[in-house]
Amino acid sequence: MNQTHTFCDTLISTSNPLKQLGWKPFFQQQLTLDDYDNTIFARVIAHHRSGYLLATEAGQVHLNVHHSLPNMTVGDWVILNEDQQFVRLLDRLSLFSRKAAGSKVAEQLIAANVDTVFIVCSLNHDFNLSRIERYLALVHEADVEPVIVLSKADLCDDVDELKSQVQKLDPLLVIETVNGLDAESTSKLMSWCNEGQTVAFIGSSGVGKSTLVNALLGQQEQSTGHIREDDSKGRHTTTSRSIHLLPAGGILIDTPGMREIQLVDCEAGVSEAFADVEALADHCRFGDCKHQTEPGCAVQAAIENGSLEVRRFNNYQKLLREQAFNGATLAEQRAQSRQFGKLTRNVMSDKRKRQQSY
């Protein structure tokens, strides 16, 4: 019996499968009276190259990839007709996306309708404050609660020092240090995993996400990769996004390890992740201060007195430039696509008119 079949069997045995799938009033409010007649509410639980796997109250449904389908991702809610054909995609409560890997600027959807995101960073050579800031910008843009999970605490001699460095990014950040192989340690994360709640793990390859998923599930569902001791980089062990049902009733979305994650249209997320830097900028003498050599620059003053790290400020500027460039390029591509679509429709319309005139 495969994992997705077990998922649906467990779901059907509950008294309220839709609630356990993460159905909320937000989605209920989007329904019309017609939607209650001979329709099926389904959630995307896996996305593979061949199509989407959906979970419903009655079991699982497979939708083949087709040009008429909107771009969907794991966690999305959709409406199907009685023949299990796609009707429409419901508005999302939250959406995570990034620039697709590679040189081409294209948006890749990661997960939708998530309540809490566990940002996983291992306490070994992978520990990287700038990467954590990047993930925080992504999570804040989606307006989702972030929880920093510092993994492999058993392999680190200075856990408190590294945790303190992360806490300095934001005094209100929730941070948990865990050993993925210790059940008592990973149980700290269960308070976010109650019935109806959807959580997701994001992090780079080799940080121990699959080990944490196994710990929360209480079984060996995800394969785990060995770590090369010389550089602490793990093999990719999760290659597609999928949903798991947790013992406490919550929904867990696991994502592939991402060595590259570039931001697109993420200005608000960057602003929130670097709220301290922007608060300093409000006190600069000039409203258009570039925070370089201008007199009365509060940002440079904070760098000089040590209250703001040069690294953090440089990363703030880097992420702002990155999201602006990728966003502008993507907007241009969308505009060109719309123009091409309009041109195609006009050509087809003219062709039909000529055929009708004969």
From Swiss-Prot:
Zn(2+) binds at residues 284, 289, 291, 297. Residues 106-261 form the CP-type G domain. Binds 1 zinc ion per subunit. Its main location: cytoplasm. GO terms for cellular component: cytoplasm. One of its GO terms (molecular function) is GTPase activity. Its EC number is 3.6.1.-. GTP binds at residues 151-154, 203-211. InterPro entries: G_CP_dom, P-loop_NTPase, Ribosome_biogen_GTPase_RsgA, RsgA_GTPase_dom. Keywords: Cytoplasm, GTP-binding, Hydrolase, Metal-binding, Nucleotide-binding, Ribosome biogenesis, RNA-binding, rRNA-binding, Zinc. It holds the Pfam family RsgA_GTPase. It is found in: Cytoplasm. GO terms for biological process: ribosomal small subunit biogenesis. Its cofactor is Zn(2+). Belongs to the TRAFAC class YlqF/YawG GTPase family. RsgA subfamily. NCBIfam families: ribosome small subunit-dependent GTPase A. Monomer. Associates with 30S ribosomal subunit, binds 16S rRNA. PANTHER family: SMALL RIBOSOMAL SUBUNIT BIOGENESIS GTPASE RSGA. One of several proteins that assist in the late maturation steps of the functional core of the 30S ribosomal subunit. Helps release RbfA from mature subunits. May play a role in the assembly of ribosomal proteins into the subunit. Circularly permuted GTPase that catalyzes slow GTP hydrolysis, GTPase activity is stimulated by the 30S ribosomal subunit. This is Small ribosomal subunit biogenesis GTPase RsgA 2. The lineage of its organism: Bacteria, Pseudomonadati, Pseudomonadota, Gammaproteobacteria, Vibrionales. The gene is rsgA2.
